[in-house]
């Protein structure tokens, strides 16, 4: 009988350990998913900001060259 009790206890401990490992794995995956999402949002924001800066710089350059062209009578 004692052997049966020890076997049951062993199975219970193994089951509890497996549940703990599964829960830890799920928590780790959630952290990875959140970090991935945060990284993607940061990259999206960086791309947006970079494009806005490029557009602004291009517009400023265009305005500058247009002003120079008008000043020297090259543009109307």
UniProtKB/Swiss-Prot annotation:
Record keywords: Differentiation, Nucleus, Transcription, Transcription regulation
Cysteines joined through disulfide linkages: none
Keyword Manganese among record annotations: no
Record keyword 4Fe-4S present: no
GO biological process terms on file: cell differentiation; positive regulation of fat cell differentiation; positive regulation of transcription by RNA polymerase II
Tissue specificity annotation: Expressed in adipose tissue (at protein level). Highly expressed in omental and subcutaneous adipose tissues. Expressed in heart, cornea, liver, kidney and spleen.
Gene Ontology annotations for the cellular component aspect, listed alphabetically: cytosol; extracellular exosome; nucleoplasm; nucleus
Subcellular compartments: Nucleus
Induction: Up-regulated during pre-adipocyte differentiation. Up-regulated following DNA damage induced by UV irradiation.
Task performed by this protein: Plays a role in fat cell development; promotes adipogenic differentiation and stimulates transcription initiation of master adipogenesis factors like PPARG and CEBPA at early stages of preadipocyte differentiation. Its overexpression confers resistance to the anticancer chemotherapeutic drug cisplatin.
Name of protein: Adipogenesis regulatory factor
Organism in which the protein naturally occurs: Homo sapiens (Human)
């Amino acid at each position: 009988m004692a052997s049966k009790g020890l076997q049951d206890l062993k199975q219970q401990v193994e089951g509890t350990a497996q549940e703990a490992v599964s829960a830890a794995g799920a928590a780790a995956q959630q952290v990875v998913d959140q970090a991935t999402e945060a990284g993607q949002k940061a990259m999206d924001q960086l791309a947006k900001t970079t494009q806005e800066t490029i557009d602004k710089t291009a517009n400023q350059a265009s305005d500058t060259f247009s002003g120079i062209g008008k000043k020297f009578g090259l543009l109307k």
